[in-house]
Structure formats: structure tokens, C-alpha cells
Amino acid sequence: MSSTGPGRRVCRQARIGHVLMGGTAPVVVQSMTNTDTADAAATALQVFDLWQAGSEVVRITVNSPEAAARVAEIRLRLDDMGCTAPLVGDFHFNGDRLLRDYPDCARALAKYRINPGNVGKGAKGDDKFAFMIRQAIEYDKAVRIGVNWGSLDQTLANRLMDENARRPHPLPAEAIMREALIISALDNAEKAVGLGLSPDQVILSCKVSHVQDLIAVYRELARRCDYALHLGLTEAGMGSKGIVASTAALSVLLQEGIGDTIRVSLTPEPGESRTKEVVVAQEILQTMGIRSFTPLVTACPGCGRTTSTFFQELAQRIQGYLREQMPLWRAEYPGVEMLNVAVMGCVVNGPGESKLADVGISLPGTGEVPVAPVYVDGEKTVTLKGERIAEEFQAIVDAYVRKNYGEGGAKRRRVIAVRPA
């Protein structure tokens, strides 16, 4: 059973290294490191981990001479590890000086992120911005003009507030702040293009920390330009709050066809892997039917009929196993990301959901006969029982992948046939 994702806004297509963004390209998942970039080994390792998790573009902080001096080394380390993720340099305050003093850094990055709110004020700020754009032109790099609510150009914001105060019926302050974000992004994009940067190499973002503000800003930004757009709720927070807030904001915009790349800005729990933000971004796109990254595991939430936790443990085990296999499977079994596996806990919905999946198992609920029928492509093929249900079901999933997505497999042929040349 499949669903069709939403359409896409028509926009220009940018190129970040080998990754296309915007136009007809898939929505790109990206992430950001939290290591000290001056520590090249640690930063390269975290970039590699994020890339292995599925991040297609990774941003690193470039905030000091020590950091800028190590960017080229980070790129070389990644190349040696076989990591192809393009690197984005996140510049604030001193980006012009760092790009000038460290040309190897300028060359090694695939995209520069420039925040107009902290480049500088007046003529000096204009000169710094112009230098960074000229560097992007010289080295053929894309530029994200990333405006942020927390570092908005206050001169612009104050001017718009003053103009609003003179209106017969002033607009709410939040509406003016939203407009200031949009104007800042569009005006600076126009400056960059005026300096000679191709409009195809411009990506815009307007980051805020509240869901309704983000939706309103991006709807208007999308209406007023044809640049590729980077979506993300800044400072989304920790845990379930951060996941829910990001999902709520991004899903609305993506459903309207707005957004060409996304980043989920989660604050990791102490000791938690940075890769969680990548998984959440992928799952937003996959659950909306926009992209597929990992075989989907359908599992029931459990109820009074499922007093055993075995079905939950099996669902978790299968989901973890499939995700672990994807770095290898992605190359060996084209199309396997479309696989749907069902792990159900009782007879109420178990057989029905299992039949709709590619491979499904209906485990026994409370009071049911302790056997688990397995369905493959809608047909019951075997009934499992005993202590090795988990191992046997995993082996069935493995065999299905090899048969259907391996060399000569029917689903592999179908996937290759529909992929553009």
C-alpha cells in the first residue's frame, strides 16, 4: 500500500558539491556538528557519523583562525574515510577575514552560510558581505543567506517598526518582525546576485523558534521569491518537545510544497548521539511520503490485549536491524528503502496489517494461541512459535530483501526502471 507525497514549489536549483538542492531534486537532509572545528579528528569523525546516519550535507562552525586552518584537513580526512558529504561553513562576525586568510578553507567548503545580521553595519558591513560573496564566486560555491530571529538587523527592524507606528492601523509587532526577516533575506539575496553570484547558487533561510511564526514567514518568503529554501525551526529544544515542534512546523510547509532542504535542530540529551536529528528529519520526510530512506516498520501501540512486551521488543529489534543494514543495503539492494515490515501484537489488526506489508508478523495477544503467522506479499507463508521467533522472522526479512532487491530481483528491476537516467 503506497501513498503519494505532496507537490513541490517551483524554484531554482542550487548545487552544493555533488548534491542538488531545489528544482526537481529531492528534499535534502542536512545536519550540523557540535565539535570544536579546530579539532579536525573529532569533527571529521562526527561528520562521518552524521553522513552514515543519512545526512546528505553537513555544516560545521568556522568561527576562528584555528577552526578555519583545519577545514581543509577535515575534508581530506573525510575523503580518506570515503565520506562524500559536502561541508558547509557556518560564518558569523569574521567570515570575511577567515575566508581571506585561509584560502584552503574557502576551497574545501561546498557552501558558505552568511548571516546578514552579524556581518557588520553600514559601509563596513557591506564591504565584508561583498568580499564573502566574491569569494563564493571565485571558488564556485553556493551561499545560504541565513537570517535568524535572534540576530536580526536591528536597524532594519527599527525602521519597519517606526513605519508601522505611523500607520492609521498599526500591525502587530510580530507581523513586523516577520516582515523584517523576509526583507533582510530578500534584500541580501538581491545584493549577492548584483555582485555577480548566480541566483541558482543562492539558498535562503529565515529561522525562528516558534511554529506559527516559521509557517507564516516561509509561506510569504516562498510567495515572493524563487530561490531554494532551507527549512528549520531554530532552537527547537530537547527531547519530545523539540521533535514535536520541528515536525509540526516542517510538516505544514512541506505539505504545501515549501522547502528544499531541512535540518532538525534538536538539543541532544546528555550522552545522546548527534545523529538523532538526522533520523528525525528522515522520518518526517518518509512518513509524509516525500522520500524513503529506511524500510518502514509498522507496529501497533499495544493495548489490554497485548500484555506481553515481546511485540514491542521485536519491532524495536527489526527497526534497529534495518537501520544498521542500510549503509550496506543502500548500494547492494536498490529500492530496499521502500520495504514495509509489519510487527503486530494481536489478532485484531495483526493479520490485516501484516497482509498489507511486504513482510508482516502477527504475534499472539493475551489469551491467544502462542503462534505467530507470517505474511509475505499478502500471503500467509509460515507460522512461527517457540523461543526463536525473533531470529526466524529476521531471517525471513533478510531472505525477502535478497530475493526481491538483489541482482535480478523483481522489485530491484522495478525501482531501476523508474529512476531517471
From Swiss-Prot:
The keyword Nucleus does not apply. [4Fe-4S] cluster binds at C300, C303, C346, E353. The gene is ispG. Keywords: 4Fe-4S, Iron, Iron-sulfur, Isoprene biosynthesis, Metal-binding, Oxidoreductase. GO terms for biological process: isopentenyl diphosphate biosynthetic process, methylerythritol 4-phosphate pathway; terpenoid biosynthetic process. Binds 1 [4Fe-4S] cluster. It is an enzyme of class 1 (oxidoreductase). Gene3D superfamilies: Dihydropteroate synthase-like, Sulfite Reductase Hemoprotein, domain 1. Converts 2C-methyl-D-erythritol 2,4-cyclodiphosphate (ME-2,4cPP) into 1-hydroxy-2-methyl-2-(E)-butenyl 4-diphosphate. Belongs to the IspG family. Its cofactor is [4Fe-4S] cluster. The lineage of its organism: Bacteria, Pseudomonadati, Pseudomonadota, Betaproteobacteria, Neisseriales. Pathway: Isoprenoid biosynthesis; isopentenyl diphosphate biosynthesis via DXP pathway; isopentenyl diphosphate from 1-deoxy-D-xylulose 5-phosphate: step 5/6. It holds the Pfam family GcpE. It catalyses: (2E)-4-hydroxy-3-methylbut-2-enyl diphosphate + oxidized [flavodoxin] + H2O + 2 H(+) = 2-C-methyl-D-erythritol 2,4-cyclic diphosphate + reduced [flavodoxin]. Its EC number is 1.17.7.3. One of its GO terms (molecular function) is 4-hydroxy-3-methylbut-2-enyl-diphosphate synthase activity (flavodoxin). InterPro entries: Dihydropteroate_synth-like_sf (IPR011005), IspG_bac (IPR016425), IspG_bac-typ (IPR004588), NO2/SO3_Rdtase_4Fe4S_sf (IPR045854). This is 4-hydroxy-3-methylbut-2-en-1-yl diphosphate synthase (flavodoxin).
